[in-house]
Amino acid sequence: MNLRRQLVLVSLLLLTLPWAGCQFLREMEIALRQGQAQAVAAAATAVAASLAERPDALYPNRERLRTADDPEGSLYAPMLDSPPLLDGYEDGWDTSIQGHYSSLETRVPRLDYRAGVHGGTLYLMLQVTDESVTYHDPGLSPEPNGDRLILRTWLDNRRQDYVIATPAPGSVRAQYASPRHPGVDAGQIRGFWQDTREGYAIELALPLSITGQRLGLYAVDVDGHRSSGWRTAGNTGPLDLTAPPWLIYPPQALQTELARFAQPGQRLRVTDRHGRLLAEALAPATGLADDDDDTFWLLQALYRRLLAEEVTDDRAAPQGNGYLQGTEITAALAGTAVEHWYRSDSAGRHLLAAAAPVRGAGQVIGAVVVEQNSEQYLSLT
């Protein structure tokens, strides 16, 4: 073979190298994505299978599993990192207003609520819009006769009403507003009543054990008419005889169970069958450093670049009323395990979320969501 032919063959070979390199990189990218998706999906499926054997962990009260969703009436109380100081001010609350209720006729009074649980205690931050606050006057009657708040729980299939009333702003404790339930002390419900520019605020703490996993509340506005013309705002009312709406909060048994499955760099979440967050566990990532990651820099840059070209969805944060949104969650609650990529807040990083349905009694009773970012997976490869 003469020199000219040899040069032609070498030139052709060199021309194929970029194409071969691109093919190699593409196959590597596909393998990385498939590997991460399979690993995260397997984790979600394993947790879902474990929880399927313990439906009581998701639903301590099985009756809630059989009832329809009530996003307007039910109260959602997420887990709090620390208990708030009961002083009637909202600066101790990280969450925004989770829901509000108002009088149908005049829109006043209006009741806004925040709720959270910590250490077996339910905390409430209630803000009432009232054009004219009327305080209880002990000289008129021992029974509350001014503006007040009613709490309604449900124990042993019977309701228990409590009233919060005061002659002046300051510390408050509940009183019975209906026949007393045996073994329940109204004084366990305590808090602080504070005047506000719009009306008043009441910050309360009460044991979860006395709620029966249901809670109704409504503000009573007497508006200067102590014997007539009352207006109310809340998720229940004085004439309601049925059980109050559900109080939805993370069951401690479920939180403990979920923490056992958390792997470094993964966030685990469990929702009920309506998509409301019931438990969450996050294990700190290991093996990651921003400046001196051991992962081969070219592989890291490649994975970021290829994901950036294909991932366009932003991850929605949990709503104040507890609902989680996402393509994979919708599919899991419909009975199908799915993975989906999202953009991350961190530059160049992306988030993989895999969801699997939790099945029980022949139906989907919830979903398990496992999240892991792309950088954490690369550190493990």
Predicted features by range, described:
Residues 320-339:
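Soluble sensory domains of the PAS superfamily and closely related sensory modules
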Residues 6-7, 372-381:
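Membrane-interface helix-start motif
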Residues 26-48, 71:
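Juxtamembrane membrane-water interface segments immediately C-terminal to a transmembrane helix
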Residues 1-26:
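Extreme N-terminal signal-anchor transmembrane helix of membrane signaling/transducer proteins, especially
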Residues 110, 187-189, 337-339, 347-357:
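A short beta-strand signature within small-molecule sensing/ligand-binding domains used
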Residues 366-370:
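Sensory beta-strand/linker motifs that couple input domains to effectors
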Residues 51, 58-322:
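Structural preference for beta-rich elements and adjacent junctions enriched in aromatics
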Residues 205-207, 344, 353-362:
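A short, hydrophobic, proline-anchored segment that marks a local hinge/packing element in signaling
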